[in-house]
């Protein structure tokens, strides 16, 4: 497995801050102590079946479930692009305290509407001084501007990233999308980064990364033209539009099927209840986007 290959051969313990049902923890032997946190209680319960494990159900960005412990090995595949309650919006003082701690000395917090770099900050907060971490991340975290650009600059200045690989066909449920695999350490004097795209790789010095505004997109540094495959001209913005269209298409099909089932089985809850639930989700996200802290301008895309 690509992620396991980036970690030391001998691992005594491993931590996954967003462990789901424990899929990544299961790649380690029964002799390895496994620690995890998962926000979905049902998924956390499945993960508890893993031998030699300690799993908590909860929000890893709101509480340190393993206080005073730092891990030599961390592996993670956090959800991409989800909102989070950073300290300025967190009414619970204890939860706000942990969110502040993971961003201690950072120039700013991750934006409220995207927790990608908050997960990175948490991973580094829990990583031991000589530890190694590997994490899958959506490609947007590598190039988005404003607050995230400032955080990337801070991380590159600390020598956090040793390797960034473009995984062009990562499997997620029923779809295959490109993601980035980040190999990280607590800090290092070596600020260069090895960028990898399939068989092509290139080590890039700090000065060049700085010239590019701390954009860490693999295709910016690796000669993607040598990669003769369908992804060589990958456009992340067009891809996002395609995903949104697919979500709408799948939702339409699901609603149509649900309407048919309601006609067949009158014991099912009325379709209107389902539609009301969907509308509530839409209204929630419209409200969050309209708040001043989440306003997006043209500058956000630069």
Spans of features found by a protein language model:
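A conserved structural/catalytic subdomain of Rossmann-like adenosyl-cofactor enzymes
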Residues: 68, 72-302
